[in-house]
Protein backbone atom coordinates (compact mmCIF):
# COMPACT_ATOMS: atom_id res chain seq x y z
CA UNK A 1 0.00 0.00 0.00
CA UNK A 2 1.53 3.37 -0.99
CA UNK A 3 2.59 5.68 1.83
CA UNK A 4 1.74 9.36 2.11
CA UNK A 5 4.71 10.48 -0.01
CA UNK A 6 3.84 7.96 -2.72
CA UNK A 7 0.27 9.24 -2.78
CA UNK A 8 1.50 12.81 -3.14
CA UNK A 9 3.73 11.76 -6.03
CA UNK A 10 0.77 10.06 -7.70
CA UNK A 11 -1.25 13.25 -7.31
CA UNK A 12 1.52 15.34 -8.87
CA UNK A 13 1.64 12.98 -11.83
CA UNK A 14 -2.14 13.07 -12.14
CA UNK A 15 -2.15 16.87 -12.21
CA UNK A 16 0.70 17.08 -14.70
CA UNK A 17 2.02 20.32 -13.23
CA UNK A 18 5.70 21.25 -12.96
CA UNK A 19 5.48 23.11 -9.66
CA UNK A 20 7.76 26.08 -9.12
CA UNK A 21 6.92 26.07 -5.40
CA UNK A 22 5.78 22.66 -4.15
CA UNK A 23 5.16 24.22 -0.76
CA UNK A 24 1.95 25.65 -2.22
CA UNK A 25 0.70 22.16 -3.01
CA UNK A 26 1.55 21.00 0.50
CA UNK A 27 -0.31 23.95 1.99
CA UNK A 28 -3.34 23.28 -0.23
CA UNK A 29 -3.51 19.78 1.24
CA UNK A 30 -3.10 20.87 4.88
CA UNK A 31 -6.38 20.77 6.78
CA UNK A 32 -6.88 23.06 9.77
CA UNK A 33 -7.07 20.05 12.11
CA UNK A 34 -3.44 19.22 11.27
CA UNK A 35 -2.15 22.70 12.01
CA UNK A 36 -4.22 22.75 15.20
CA UNK A 37 -2.60 19.55 16.47
CA UNK A 38 0.84 20.73 15.35
CA UNK A 39 0.52 24.43 16.12
CA UNK A 40 3.95 24.54 17.74
CA UNK A 41 5.43 24.12 14.25
CA UNK A 42 3.84 27.32 12.91
CA UNK A 43 2.29 25.57 9.91
CA UNK A 44 -0.26 27.27 7.65
CA UNK A 45 -3.49 25.52 6.68
CA UNK A 46 -5.30 25.66 3.34
CA UNK A 47 -8.06 28.12 4.24
CA UNK A 48 -6.53 31.19 2.58
CA UNK A 49 -5.84 29.20 -0.58
CA UNK A 50 -9.42 27.96 -0.47
CA UNK A 51 -10.61 31.59 -0.44
CA UNK A 52 -8.51 32.35 -3.51
CA UNK A 53 -9.47 29.14 -5.30
CA UNK A 54 -13.16 29.86 -4.81
CA UNK A 55 -12.78 33.05 -6.87
CA UNK A 56 -10.74 31.27 -9.54
CA UNK A 57 -13.37 28.55 -9.74
CA UNK A 58 -16.29 30.92 -10.20
CA UNK A 59 -14.51 32.88 -12.93
CA UNK A 60 -13.38 29.73 -14.76
CA UNK A 61 -16.82 28.13 -14.79
CA UNK A 62 -18.56 31.41 -15.67
CA UNK A 63 -16.26 31.92 -18.65
CA UNK A 64 -16.68 28.33 -19.81
CA UNK A 65 -20.48 28.41 -19.59
CA UNK A 66 -20.69 31.79 -21.32
CA UNK A 67 -18.70 30.47 -24.28
CA UNK A 68 -20.16 26.96 -24.48
CA UNK A 69 -23.85 27.69 -23.81
CA UNK A 70 -24.81 30.64 -26.07
CA UNK A 71 -28.45 29.54 -26.02
CA UNK A 72 -28.78 30.10 -22.26
CA UNK A 73 -29.89 33.37 -20.69
CA UNK A 74 -28.34 34.89 -17.56
CA UNK A 75 -30.74 33.17 -15.19
CA UNK A 76 -30.12 29.69 -16.62
CA UNK A 77 -26.36 30.26 -16.65
CA UNK A 78 -26.43 31.33 -13.01
CA UNK A 79 -28.44 28.27 -12.00
CA UNK A 80 -26.16 25.92 -13.93
CA UNK A 81 -23.03 27.49 -12.48
CA UNK A 82 -24.39 27.16 -8.94
CA UNK A 83 -25.01 23.46 -9.48
CA UNK A 84 -21.58 22.87 -11.01
CA UNK A 85 -19.59 24.62 -8.28
CA UNK A 86 -21.65 23.35 -5.34
CA UNK A 87 -20.12 21.23 -2.60
CA UNK A 88 -21.26 17.79 -3.88
CA UNK A 89 -19.79 18.48 -7.34
CA UNK A 90 -16.46 19.68 -5.95
CA UNK A 91 -16.28 16.74 -3.56
CA UNK A 92 -16.88 14.39 -6.47
CA UNK A 93 -13.94 15.89 -8.37
CA UNK A 94 -11.76 15.73 -5.25
CA UNK A 95 -12.55 12.02 -4.93
CA UNK A 96 -11.63 11.51 -8.57
CA UNK A 97 -8.26 13.14 -7.84
CA UNK A 98 -8.01 11.13 -4.59
CA UNK A 99 -7.28 14.30 -2.65
CA UNK A 100 -8.60 12.75 0.56
CA UNK A 101 -5.74 10.27 0.68
CA UNK A 102 -3.20 13.09 0.33
CA UNK A 103 -4.52 15.44 3.00
CA UNK A 104 -2.46 16.36 6.04
CA UNK A 105 -5.11 15.91 8.70
CA UNK A 106 -5.33 15.76 12.47
CA UNK A 107 -5.78 12.35 14.05
CA UNK A 108 -9.14 13.25 15.56
CA UNK A 109 -10.55 14.49 12.27
CA UNK A 110 -9.24 11.43 10.47
CA UNK A 111 -10.84 9.07 12.99
CA UNK A 112 -14.19 10.78 12.44
CA UNK A 113 -14.09 10.16 8.68
CA UNK A 114 -12.69 13.51 7.59
CA UNK A 115 -10.85 12.14 4.57
CA UNK A 116 -14.16 11.46 2.83
CA UNK A 117 -16.20 14.35 4.23
CA UNK A 118 -17.68 16.34 1.32
CA UNK A 119 -17.03 19.76 2.86
CA UNK A 120 -13.35 18.98 3.47
CA UNK A 121 -12.87 17.51 0.00
CA UNK A 122 -14.59 20.45 -1.70
CA UNK A 123 -12.48 22.92 0.27
CA UNK A 124 -9.31 21.02 -0.64
CA UNK A 125 -10.13 21.20 -4.35
CA UNK A 126 -10.69 24.95 -4.11
CA UNK A 127 -7.41 25.30 -2.20
CA UNK A 128 -5.67 23.29 -4.91
CA UNK A 129 -6.97 25.70 -7.55
CA UNK A 130 -5.71 28.61 -5.45
CA UNK A 131 -2.28 27.01 -5.24
CA UNK A 132 -2.13 26.36 -8.99
CA UNK A 133 -3.17 29.97 -9.64
CA UNK A 134 -0.34 31.36 -7.50
CA UNK A 135 2.22 28.95 -8.94
CA UNK A 136 1.19 28.74 -12.59
CA UNK A 137 -1.25 31.58 -13.29
CA UNK A 138 -4.94 31.91 -14.06
CA UNK A 139 -4.95 30.08 -17.38
CA UNK A 140 -3.48 26.90 -15.87
CA UNK A 141 -5.75 27.04 -12.81
CA UNK A 142 -8.87 27.65 -14.89
CA UNK A 143 -7.88 24.87 -17.26
CA UNK A 144 -7.57 22.43 -14.37
CA UNK A 145 -10.98 23.43 -13.04
CA UNK A 146 -12.70 22.98 -16.40
CA UNK A 147 -10.91 19.71 -17.14
CA UNK A 148 -12.66 18.09 -14.19
CA UNK A 149 -15.88 20.08 -13.96
CA UNK A 150 -16.93 20.28 -17.63
CA UNK A 151 -18.02 16.60 -17.70
CA UNK A 152 -20.36 17.31 -14.78
CA UNK A 153 -22.37 19.90 -16.72
CA UNK A 154 -24.23 17.20 -18.64
CA UNK A 155 -24.95 15.42 -15.36
CA UNK A 156 -26.38 18.63 -13.92
CA UNK A 157 -28.59 19.25 -16.94
CA UNK A 158 -29.93 15.70 -16.77
CA UNK A 159 -30.49 15.78 -13.03
CA UNK A 160 -27.83 13.24 -12.11
CA UNK A 161 -26.13 15.41 -9.48
CA UNK A 162 -27.34 16.47 -6.06
CA UNK A 163 -29.73 19.40 -6.04
CA UNK A 164 -28.67 22.95 -5.24
CA UNK A 165 -31.40 23.82 -2.74
CA UNK A 166 -30.26 27.43 -2.28
CA UNK A 167 -30.73 28.22 -5.96
CA UNK A 168 -34.08 26.40 -6.06
CA UNK A 169 -35.33 28.37 -3.07
CA UNK A 170 -34.29 31.73 -4.47
CA UNK A 171 -35.90 30.93 -7.82
CA UNK A 172 -39.14 29.93 -6.09
CA UNK A 173 -39.22 33.18 -4.14
CA UNK A 174 -38.51 35.28 -7.23
CA UNK A 175 -41.09 33.46 -9.34
CA UNK A 176 -43.74 34.33 -6.78
CA UNK A 177 -42.88 37.98 -6.61
CA UNK A 178 -40.71 37.79 -3.54
CA UNK A 179 -37.39 39.30 -2.53
CA UNK A 180 -33.95 37.91 -1.82
CA UNK A 181 -33.67 35.42 1.00
CA UNK A 182 -30.88 35.85 3.54
CA UNK A 183 -28.71 33.26 5.27
CA UNK A 184 -27.35 33.68 8.77
CA UNK A 185 -25.17 31.44 10.90
CA UNK A 186 -27.15 30.85 14.07
CA UNK A 187 -24.63 28.76 15.93
CA UNK A 188 -21.05 27.50 15.73
CA UNK A 189 -19.94 24.62 17.91
CA UNK A 190 -16.67 22.79 18.41
CA UNK A 191 -13.00 23.75 18.01
CA UNK A 192 -11.76 25.43 14.83
CA UNK A 193 -10.62 22.16 13.28
CA UNK A 194 -13.87 20.29 14.00
CA UNK A 195 -16.74 22.78 13.83
CA UNK A 196 -20.44 22.23 13.38
CA UNK A 197 -22.60 25.04 11.98
CA UNK A 198 -26.30 25.79 12.25
CA UNK A 199 -27.64 28.11 9.55
CA UNK A 200 -30.99 29.80 9.15
CA UNK A 201 -32.65 31.17 6.04
CA UNK A 202 -34.71 34.33 6.47
CA UNK A 203 -37.47 35.65 4.26
CA UNK A 204 -38.54 39.21 5.09
CA UNK A 205 -36.96 38.82 8.50
CA UNK A 206 -38.79 35.57 9.32
CA UNK A 207 -36.91 32.30 9.85
CA UNK A 208 -38.30 29.86 7.27
CA UNK A 209 -35.70 27.09 7.48
CA UNK A 210 -32.85 25.87 9.64
CA UNK A 211 -30.14 23.30 8.98
CA UNK A 212 -26.84 22.00 10.32
CA UNK A 213 -23.63 20.86 8.67
CA UNK A 214 -19.88 20.53 9.03
CA UNK A 215 -19.40 23.62 6.85
CA UNK A 216 -21.32 26.86 6.45
CA UNK A 217 -22.18 25.92 2.86
CA UNK A 218 -23.59 22.56 3.91
CA UNK A 219 -25.62 24.13 6.72
CA UNK A 220 -27.07 26.74 4.35
CA UNK A 221 -28.03 24.06 1.83
CA UNK A 222 -29.82 22.12 4.55
CA UNK A 223 -31.62 25.26 5.70
CA UNK A 224 -32.80 25.94 2.15
CA UNK A 225 -33.95 22.32 1.82
CA UNK A 226 -36.04 22.66 4.98
CA UNK A 227 -37.55 25.90 3.69
CA UNK A 228 -38.52 24.26 0.39
CA UNK A 229 -40.34 21.53 2.32
CA UNK A 230 -42.64 24.06 4.00
CA UNK A 231 -46.08 24.01 2.43
CA UNK A 232 -46.81 27.59 3.50
CA UNK A 233 -43.71 29.11 1.91
CA UNK A 234 -45.50 29.86 -1.35
CA UNK A 235 -48.21 31.90 0.32
CA UNK A 236 -45.57 33.79 2.29
CA UNK A 237 -43.83 34.68 -0.97
CA UNK A 238 -47.06 35.91 -2.51
CA UNK A 239 -47.88 38.13 0.46
CA UNK A 240 -46.93 41.71 -0.39
CA UNK A 241 -45.94 44.24 2.21
Curated annotation (Swiss-Prot):
It comes from Pelotomaculum thermopropionicum (strain DSM 13744 / JCM 10971 / SI). Its EC number is 3.1.26.3. The active site is at 54, 126. Residues 8-137 form the RNase III domain. It catalyses: Endonucleolytic cleavage to 5'-phosphomonoester. This is Ribonuclease 3. It comes from the Bacteria. Residues 214-241 are annotated as: Disordered. The gene is rnc. The keyword Cytoplasm applies. GO terms for cellular component: cytoplasm.
Amino acid sequence: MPDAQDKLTLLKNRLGIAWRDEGLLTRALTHSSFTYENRQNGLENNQRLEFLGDAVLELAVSDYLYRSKPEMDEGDLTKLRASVVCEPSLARVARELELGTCLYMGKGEERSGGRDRPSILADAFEALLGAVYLDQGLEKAAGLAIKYLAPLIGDVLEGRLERDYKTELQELVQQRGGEQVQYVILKEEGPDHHKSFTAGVLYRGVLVGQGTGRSKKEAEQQAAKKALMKSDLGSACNHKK
